[in-house]
């Protein structure tokens, strides 16, 4: 490796500081490779921007009083004029890289004679790629599929001059501290650490972050990084990896109903895997095997990432992933999972297939398939990670005329980031289109793509149409008989086939770019291809783009093509900025030994994920900033997980132990409404809707209607204390907008003589207040006539410990503002209770004989500290449970600020954080708007006659998880004496349909 000018500059800085203890090369070694071993010509280390900056700061702060001089900012311009403009740009590059030239769609365009403009074009290209000139210098030597092929050899003077210019420009850019990325984001606001971690947790792990994780994230950028990395484990992260990888590969087509020959043990698969017969007699085993085959490539990707193995192993792994069923059939010898759980996978090798040769004998078993009786031995399968996984090969099958080109196309696309179909314009020349003389090999209109595509297709030479290894008779190749023996099919052309061939002679030989597959790698040609690909700089860039939609909610941008479009420049700016970010991420990915968890973390910490808003100055940049940051629509699966994380359960979830169900359960969002809500099936629908449509909005509305009542009623019913609740942690079901204070208490069981007292103490302002008592647990047995009732003898009111007034129970109905429960048939619940006192039936109390309330107004003449003392008792039902009442003091005007209204607003404020991830003040207009919604709903509900429950059958319903039974309803689930559960249901519906709940 040659020491670039920037390194020479650093060394000169170091040499000028005579007193420092470390030599320049030792310092470079520590920064670059973590040791004090000196860097030599053979060191693979490459200088990056960050490393130059670190070295500069170390030398600057090393004790030398003089600031080291920065590189000469005119050096690059001077050097370019003397050594590059004429000798390289005009002599070589201007042939194609000009407007309307062959390379006019590239990111590097020159103009004849425009020295300064051309230098800036190179500078911009380097900033865009952000790889210290690696792409530029590789392309001029013919690498990275350079359309112009080799233009400069590494030994040439032109290459030396261009490399030196690159070094000078990189040094200048580093010293200026300015990049085009910084400029692109100068008017963009980023999410803070806690906001970022919340989004990351919901997307990566399907859960909310823990408090400890939030604290770590808020401590520093490194803390945020560690917190994000900590999310990447467990079932939620595994689901994210499987789902996201399938969004690209679409191998779940075979999970969702597409037929797969390679997993059909009753058909072609049984023909080649003798051990498949062992599963015939096991009920359901065929489905467990199909699950194992279908999920193997996705499980391989997940295994590599979850175990911090180099991402290159996705292609180079000498194993596949097996479950209990495929381990048996593949003869893997791996103990994994069990018959009852096909979802558990482990690494294992495929050692179970056989060739069809002269030693192969089989019989057909009616109702089952093919039984292999004899065979020559088991094939030593040459694993190449995903590339020769049975499901990958079958998902992208070939034909006798396609000749593995589809497989090659998707290999380029997914693992090198190249879309062959858009890499060059398609010809419309009728002469070229009419060419039948092997145009893919000879016609320039075709070879522009096929020269690159066909060698990779050749690397798939050992795999037949369905994906089986060397599936033709004899087990020597996979070449179609129409090519080998055309005379069998009345084809006039003579055969080109020669015994021992494994590839077509009328196509490019197997290879990639300028590399040709060695003759000793024919049997494992895909393994050889994988080795070439993972060492290609494009592999890391493709990995970033592969995972980009999973995090950002949109595919990586492509360059705009029509310069006359009104938004061309804005889209071009966005594309350039994103390409710069992707190049930076890819560079870090390589330096982190292709650790995918580190890559995902870098992507999350990037401004492309964290951007949350634009400043007013960016009002004219809506097109440029359209693909940034938040407001990423959640997929059906992600919304399902968010529901469970926040609400406690998924919409209409039910368990399913069918071995063909890869999840083990079903939900409304994941199954019945998945496609309606923008999901995919990987068969006919392969692109997710990234924008909410009217149909999707209807699904979101139905989900909200199905969940809102149930989650609200259950949270109040199942958890008596606020601290135990998931949602309603600041209010009780009895807390109303008018509430000042409430007391729920069991009263003494017995008779009039056994009555007891219960106090509510609170400060009150002057004015009219409402006092209410609610009986909560009425019970009556028709057989025994046992009856639990609540009796109120009196309500005594004190101010500053001085008795102000006494309201006798028998006088409630004569008190101002009297109100009581009215049943649907118009009858009232409650009345005066008479007791035999010394032989006289005397009115002594108010009897609440059913679940319901009684209330009246109290005039508070002056502000002060008040006590409401309730004198009460209850009758015995015979079960040992005392009568329970809730006494409440409240305002009569909804406009009053009460303890209840403040608690409700605090609850709404909490919901904004919990459900939307937004931190707002209690006085925020959004909080006020939601409060008004609740207030109006509550007031309207109080006008209904059938309002003692959160729903009233048959006109209303409340849906619960399937494990909630009638007995739960009978225990009081949904009882709503204050009509607040109903009111909160409307609020929950609001949040469940909120844009920020459906997006992250």
Model-derived features: positions:
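Generic long, charged, amphipathic alpha-helical segments
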Residues: 558-569
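His/Asp/Glu-rich metal/cofactor-coordinating catalytic motifs and the adjacent surface-exposed loops
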Residues: 177-179, 188-204, 208-209, 224, ...
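Short catalytic/ligand-binding loop motif for oxyanion handling, primarily in non-cytosolic enzymes
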Residues: 101-106, 254, 455-457, 608, ...
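Extracellular structured ligand-interaction cores
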Residues: 83, 90-93, 105-107, 131-133, ...
């Amino acid at each position: 490796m040659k020491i670039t000018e920037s390194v020479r500059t650093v060394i000169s800085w170091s040499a000028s500081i005579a007193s420092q203890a470390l030599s320049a090369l030792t310092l470079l070694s520590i920064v670059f490779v973590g040791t004090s071993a000196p860097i030599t010509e053979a060191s693979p280390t490459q200088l990056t921007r960050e490393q130059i900056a670190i070295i500069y700061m170390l030398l600057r702060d090393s004790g030398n009083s003089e600031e080291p001089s920065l590189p000469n900012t005119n050096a690059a311009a001077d050097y370019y004029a003397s050594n590059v403009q004429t000798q390289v740009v005009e002599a070589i590059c201007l042939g194609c890289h000009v407007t309307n030239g062959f390379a006019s769609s590239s990111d590097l365009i020159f103009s004849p004679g425009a020295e300064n403009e051309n230098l800036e074009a190179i500078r911009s290209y380097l900033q865009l790629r952000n790889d210290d000139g690696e792409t530029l210098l590789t392309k001029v030597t013919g690498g990275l599929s350079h359309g112009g092929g080799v233009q400069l050899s590494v030994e040439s003077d032109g290459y030396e001059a261009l490399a030196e210019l690159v070094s000078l420009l990189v040094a200048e850019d580093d010293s200026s501290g300015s990049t085009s990325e910084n400029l692109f984001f100068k008017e963009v606001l980023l999410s803070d650490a806690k906001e970022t971690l919340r989004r990351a947790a919901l997307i990566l792990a399907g859960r909310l972050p823990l408090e400890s994780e939030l604290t770590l994230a808020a401590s520093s950028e490194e803390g945020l990084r560690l917190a994000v990395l900590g999310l990447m484990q467990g079932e939620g992260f595994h689901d994210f990896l499987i789902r996201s990888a399938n969004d690209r590969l679409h191998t779940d087509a075979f999970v969702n109903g597409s037929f797969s020959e390679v997993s059909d043990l009753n058909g072609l698969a049984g023909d080649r895997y003798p051990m498949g017969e062992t599963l015939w007699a096991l009920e359901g085993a065929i489905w467990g095997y199909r699950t194992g085959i279908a999920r193997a490539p996705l499980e391989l990707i997940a295994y590599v990432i979850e175990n911090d193995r180099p991402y290159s192993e996705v292609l180079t792994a000498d194993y596949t992933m097996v479950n209990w069923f495929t381990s048996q059939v593949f003869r893997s010898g791996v103990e994994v999972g069990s018959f009852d759980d096909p979802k558990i996978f482990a690494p294992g090798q495929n050692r179970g297939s056989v060739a069809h040769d002269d030693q192969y004998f089989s019989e057909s078993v009616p109702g089952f398939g093919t039984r292999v009786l004899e065979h020559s031995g088991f094939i030593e399968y040459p694993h190449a990670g995903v590339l020769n996984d049975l499901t990958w090969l079958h998902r992208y099958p070939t034909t006798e005329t396609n000749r593995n080109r589809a497989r090659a196309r998707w290999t380029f696309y997914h693992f090198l980031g190249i879309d062959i179909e858009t890499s060059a314009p398609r010809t419309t020349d009728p002469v070229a289109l009419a060419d039948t003389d092997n145009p893919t090999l000879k016609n320039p209109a075709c070879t522009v793509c096929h020269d690159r595509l066909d060698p990779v297709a050749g690397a798939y030479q050992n795999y037949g149409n369905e994906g089986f290894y060397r599936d033709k008779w004899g087990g020597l190749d996979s070449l179609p008989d129409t090519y080998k023996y055309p005379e069998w099919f009345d084809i006039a052309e003579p055969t080109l086939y020669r015994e021992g061939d494994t590839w077509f002679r009328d196509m490019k030989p197997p290879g990639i770019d300028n590399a040709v597959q060695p003759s000793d790698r024919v049997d494992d040609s895909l393994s050889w291809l994988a080795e070439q690909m993972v060492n290609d700089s494009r592999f890391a860039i493709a990995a970033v783009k592969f995972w980009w939609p999973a995090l950002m909610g949109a595919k990586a941008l492509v360059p705009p093509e029509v310069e006359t479009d009104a938004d061309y420049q804005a889209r071009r700016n966005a594309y350039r900025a994103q390409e710069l970010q992707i190049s930076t991420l890819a560079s870090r990915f390589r330096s982190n030994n292709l650790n995918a968890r580190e890559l995902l973390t870098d992507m999350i910490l990037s401004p492309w994920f964290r951007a949350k808003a634009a400043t007013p100055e960016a009002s004219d940049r809506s097109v440029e900033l359209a693909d940034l940051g938040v407001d990423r629509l959640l997929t059906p699966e992600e919304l399902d997980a968010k529901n469970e994380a926040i609400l406690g359960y998924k919409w209409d979830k039910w368990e399913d132990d069918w071995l063909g169900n890869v999840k083990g359960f079903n939900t409304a969002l994941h199954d019945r409404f998945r496609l309606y809500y923008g999901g995919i099936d990987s068969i006919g629908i392969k692109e997710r809707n990234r924008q909410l449509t009217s149909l999707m909005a209807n699904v979101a509305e139905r989900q909200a209607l199905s969940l809102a009542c149930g989650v609200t009623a259950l949270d109040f019913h199942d958890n008596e204390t606020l601290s135990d609740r998931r949602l309603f942690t600041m209010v009780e079901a009895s807390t109303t907008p008018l509430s000042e204070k409430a007391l729920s208490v069991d009263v003494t069981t017995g008779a009039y003589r056994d009555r007891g007292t219960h106090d509510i103490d609170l400060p009150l302002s002057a004015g009219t207040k409402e006092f209410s008592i609610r009986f909560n647990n009425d019970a009556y047995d028709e057989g025994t006539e046992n009856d639990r009732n609540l009796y109120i003898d009196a309500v005594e009111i004190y101010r500053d410990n001085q008795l102000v007034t006494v309201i006798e129970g028998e006088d409630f109905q004569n008190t101002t503002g009297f109100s009581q429960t009215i049943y649907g048939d118009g009858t009232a619940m409650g009345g005066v209770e008479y007791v035999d006192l010394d032989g006289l039936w005397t009115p002594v109390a108010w009897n609440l004989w059913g679940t319901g309330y009684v209330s009246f107004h109290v005039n508070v003449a002056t502000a002060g500290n008040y006590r409401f003392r309730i004198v009460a008792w209850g009758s015995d039902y015979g079960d040992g449970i005392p009568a329970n009442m809730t006494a409440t003091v409240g305002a009569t005007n909804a406009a009053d600020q009460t303890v209840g209204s403040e608690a409700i607003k605090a609850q709404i404020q909490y919901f904004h954080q919990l459900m939307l991830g937004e931190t707002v003040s209690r006085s925020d207009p959004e909080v006020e708007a939601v409060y008004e919604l609740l207030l109006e709903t509550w007031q309207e509900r109080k006008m209904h006659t059938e309002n003692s429950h959160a729903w009233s059958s048959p006109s209303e319903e409340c849906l619960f998880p399937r494990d909630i039974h009638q007995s739960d309803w009978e225990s009081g689930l949904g009882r709503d004496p204050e009509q607040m559960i109903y009111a909160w249901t409307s609020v929950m519906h609001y949040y469940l349909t909120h844009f920020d709940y459906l997006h992250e």
